[in-house]
Amino acid sequence: MKPISIVAFPIPAISMLLLSAVSQAASMQPPIAKPGETWILQAKRSDEFNVKDATKWNFQTENYGVWSWKNENATVSNGKLKLTTKRESHQRTFWDGCNQQQVANYPLYYTSGVAKSRATGNYGYYEARIKGASTFPGVSPAFWMYSTIDRSLTKEGDVQYSEIDVVELTQKSAVRESDHDLHNIVVKNGKPTWMRPGSFPQTNHNGYHLPFDPRNDFHTYGVNVTKDKITWYVDGEIVGEKDNLYWHRQMNLTLSQGLRAPHTQWKCNQFYPSANKSAEGFPTSMEVDYVRTWVKVGNNNSAPGEGQSCPNTFVAVNSVQLSAAKQTLRKGQSTTLESTVLPNCATNKKVIYSSSNKNVATVNSAGVVKAKNKGTATITVKTKNKGKIDKLTIAVN
């Protein structure tokens, strides 16, 4: 179902057309549905992209790469979502994994577009119709889902993070090579351990040679996530399957375009800028015709926080986490803190920020820290429910 042209209709007729469009979308069944099965379309994680809906999608979410997300790099027109990567020099706070610290005013050179669902889920069938970006190599159009990182889970075998890549396009040396991978953090021998596709190919990697150039036209990419299996599809054909060992956490559905080689280098389990800062091939855009999410009735039951919607009863907070333990700023600089309240289904996620030394650094109710004078200050975030806290140190040079 795509946009409906509405010209010179009276208001009641327009309303009927829109209601018909909504009804048509809701009644659709996924292509993998078998006779007798009932699947329900999840409206909060589905979109035909007739409008840019900021109530459904976050278009400027947290940064985690060597590019920065910008709201204006995500546009909707003619029934398509367009995510654009641009060559734009800028600075922001950057996590330096090799030195395990936040670095203020880190120089970066590219911006891009993202649409991250505000709603979360897990088990179900996910499908998007995507056309890749024209530039190759350099960017990777992606359709994926990922959870928060829950550092409070410390028992052996606990899964702190889950990520399912429905597809990542054009990030390898050959344009037709696609990745359909899994990532996770699991507690092993008492320590949180990243499991990446390169190090754990048996459980985490699926590679596929596409029978087409993904830059030239729209194709469908899908995944079916159940308690036991994860199965990937391209244009309705199965292209990979893995046992679902670790991917049971609530995840946000995401469409994005990331930067890749030759503009990036991978080290210390993250991307860093490379020496190549060329503007050639930029701006470049991926397009999304639609994204749809279904849950099968009667076969997707699970505990809250592991794939189903939150319960109607009150859910208490058990922890709050800041994205870093220490951050360095110069006098006059500011940064916005990112706090995660867990569990995801917690009813009251409101927090209060405070500073131990307002002469050094202040923090407002939105988590914006401003460096005042040289020294150190401890910033505390505290949940209104249960009073859970986390802290970070602000050092002002």
UniProtKB/Swiss-Prot annotation:
**Keyword flag Metal-binding:** no
Question: Start and end of every GH16 domain?
Answer: 26-299
Q: Where is this site: Important for substrate recognition?
A: 260
- Alphabetically, which GO biological process terms does the record hold? carbohydrate metabolic process
Q: Name one Pfam family in it.
A: Glyco_hydro_16
EC number, UniProt record: 3.2.1.83
Q: Superkingdom of this entry's organism?
A: Bacteria
Query: Which EC class, in a word?
Result: hydrolase
Spell out the catalytic residues. 163 (nucleophile), 165, 168 (proton donor)
Principal subcellular localization: periplasm
Q: List the disulfide bonds.
A: 98-268
Q: Name one GO cellular component term.
A: periplasmic space
Q: Which PANTHER family match?
A: GLYCOSIDE HYDROLASE FAMILY 16 PROTEIN, GLYCOSYL HYDROLASE-RELATED
How is this protein named in the record?
A: Kappa-carrageenase
